[in-house]
Amino acid sequence: MQIPEKYLSSVDNVEEETQILFALSKQKDADLGMLDSKQEQIALTIGNKPIKVKQSLQSLHQSRGSTGSVLWKTSVKVVPWLLQQSWFMNSLTPKTSILELGSGISGLAGILLSPFVGNYVASDKQLYLKKIRENLDQNNASDVEVHELDWKSTPYPKDWTFDFLDYVLFFDCIYNPHLNAHLVSCLASLAERYPGMQCLFAQELRDQETLVDFLERVRPYFEVDLIKMEEINKTSVASSTNLPPANMSLFIMKPYNHEEYMLKALNEAKKCEPTDSAFCVGAVIVQNGKIVSTGYSRERPGNTHAEECAIEKFMLKNPTDSLEGAIMYSTMEPCSKRLSKKVSCTDLIVKQKFSTVVLGSLEPDIFVKCEGVDLLKKAGIVVIEKLTFQDDCLREAVRGHPPKH
C-alpha cells in the first residue's frame, strides 16, 4: 500500500500527537460509536450496494463485553471512504489477502472489500461467528472466510488456508485498556509470521489514555503513521461529504524489519578486532524507521562496548537531539556490570529512554553474570529476543577466545 508521504504523519511523540487529535475532535458521540443500538436489523446503502445487517441487541444488553453484537459507525464511515481512494484500491488485487481483527457481528468491511481481493478473513471470538456468517451470506459475501481469533490465545487461525498475508484491518477495536496488551501481542505474532504485512486501523476518538496506551505498546513492533484524511480529501475527486467525521482517525502500521537490522548489527560485530578478554558485539540504533547510528566493540578509544559506541557517536553528531523512543539492535544482551567500573550499557540505554532493545543472543556468563534483560524490562523497555540469530551472534562474540576442549 503506497500512500504519498505528504499524506502521512509519523507518530513519534504519542502523548503530544494524540493530544492534538483529541483537541481537534470536538464531536461527541452519545451512542458510544454504535450506529443504532435500538434496531434488530439495519438497512443501509453504501455506493449503490444495499446492505442489511442483523444485530443482537439481547447479547449487547445481557452479556458483558459483547461490543461485537452491533454495527459500529467507524466501519460505516471509513470503509466507503477507503473505497474512493486510488492508493487503497490500487493495492487490492485478486491475489491480495486480508485479515480483519474484531470484525464484529456485521461483517461490513468484508461485504464491501471482498469483491476486490483473493482472500478475506473475518475474525472474532467464537460467540460471534455464526451471526457474522449469516450477515455475510445474506449480503452475497459467502466467499469471505470466518474464523475464530481470540487475541488472548492463538495469534492466527489454525485452519487458515493461505500462506501469506498482505493487510490486517481493524475498526474501533481500541476501547478497553485491558485488551490492548492482547491485541498488540496478536499483531506482533502476525508480524513475526508475515513480516511483509501492513496494518490499517481506524479508531473513533473516545478515550485518549486508552489510545495512548495502545500506541505506546505497539510502537516497539511497528512504524506507525497517521493518515491525513482531510488533506487527502482536499485533492480528491470524491465529495467532501464522504470524509469520515473529525472524531475518527485512520492509521497505517508497518512491522519493523528486525531481521534486516540484526544482520546489519552482525556485520558491525564482524568489524571488531578479535580478543580473548572481551566479546565482539555489533549494535545498530533505529529511530523513526531509519538507522541513525552504529557501533561495534572497541570502535572508539578505550574498552568501549558496541551499544556505548553507537550512543556516543549519535550524541557527538547530534548534540541537541534525543534518542527517546529509539530501538537498539545488539548482537548480544547489553552489559549490566563492567569490570572496568564504567557505566553499563544497560544504564546508558535506560538513561537515553530507548523504547525497545532487540537482542541477537543473551550474554554467556564468561566474564560476569549479566542481568541486562531483567534490568531493561524493569525500566519499562520492551526486550525482543531474535534468537534465530543466536548461533551466528555467539560465534562472532567469542572470536579470538581460545577454543573449548
Curated annotation (Swiss-Prot):
Reaction catalysed by this chain? 2,5-diamino-6-hydroxy-4-(5-phosphoribosylamino)-pyrimidine + H2O + H(+) = 5-amino-6-(5-phospho-D-ribosylamino)uracil + NH4(+)
What cofactor does this protein call for? Zn(2+)
GO biological process terms on file? nucleobase-containing compound metabolic process; riboflavin biosynthetic process
> What name does UniProt use for this protein?
Diaminohydroxyphosphoribosylamino-pyrimidine deaminase
Per its record, what are the GO molecular function terms? Answer: diaminohydroxyphosphoribosylaminopyrimidine deaminase activity; metal ion binding; protein methyltransferase activity; S-adenosylmethionine-dependent methyltransferase activity
The yes or no answer to whether the keyword ATP-binding is present is no
Q: In what pathway does it function?
A: Cofactor biosynthesis; riboflavin biosynthesis; 5-amino-6-(D-ribitylamino)uracil from GTP: step 2/4
Matching Pfam families = dCMP_cyt_deam_1, Methyltransf_16
Residues annotated as binding Zn(2+) are H305, C335, C345
Q: Which organism is it from?
A: Schizosaccharomyces pombe (strain 972 / ATCC 24843)
What are the EC numbers? 3.5.4.26
Q: State any GO CC term.
A: nucleus
Decide whether keyword Lipoprotein is in the record. Answer: no
Q: Per its UniProt record, what CDD domains does this chain match?
A: Riboflavin_deaminase-reductase (cd01284)
| InterPro entries per the UniProt record, alphabetical | CMP_dCMP_dom (IPR002125), Cytidine_deaminase-like (IPR016193), Methyltransf_16 (IPR019410), SAM-dependent_MTases_sf (IPR029063)
Function of the protein: Involved in riboflavin biosynthesis. Converts 2,5-diamino-6-(ribosylamino)-4(3H)-pyrimidinone 5'-phosphate into 5-amino-6-(ribosylamino)-2,4(1H,3H)-pyrimidinedione 5'-phosphate.
